[in-house]
Amino acid sequence: DSNPIIKVEFRAEYLTRCGYIEAIQRVELFLKKLIPEYEIKISEIHLCADVQGHEFNLLDTYKFKTNSRSTKLFESKDDKLSYLNNNVFTGFSMGNGDYMLRVYNKTHEIEKFKNKSYIKPLKWDINPKYNPNKTVWRIETQIRRNKLKTIVGDNGILDGFDVVLDAIPDLWAMSMEQ
């Protein structure tokens, strides 16, 4: 694919505040005013879930079955993200580039980076099941365009904008099975 004429990147905070459907509608409304005809291609999609009740640890990395050859383990040392240094376990990732799964301590991340704390009042605090005394872990999958356009969903190859959006539940399920 050639470089796009217009590239839109949604920031996590923006998506948290308005949701992906409203964000997309706003972009489409804007584009229609500028360009009468256009085609939208998704270059990358991130799907995530925040969970409580399980404290991930180093042993969990061995419980995951994966086709990936790349697994990175992270620990926190002096508030710097580094590879295993016999300190506090803060997460791991599997895969790289076009297809990746990350599991990380979101509570630790927002304590370390205050600009990411928007998630707490916007989502966690309003969830009756949220326990502020327990750690929140984020499970996140990242799928880039090169991988997306090799996946066949119910509505065909995940190359078109609407096809990818319709396949979000299937992409999440597929990510958890990989």
How should these model regions be labeled?
Residues 1-178:
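Structured, helix-rich domain cores that form ligand/interaction pockets
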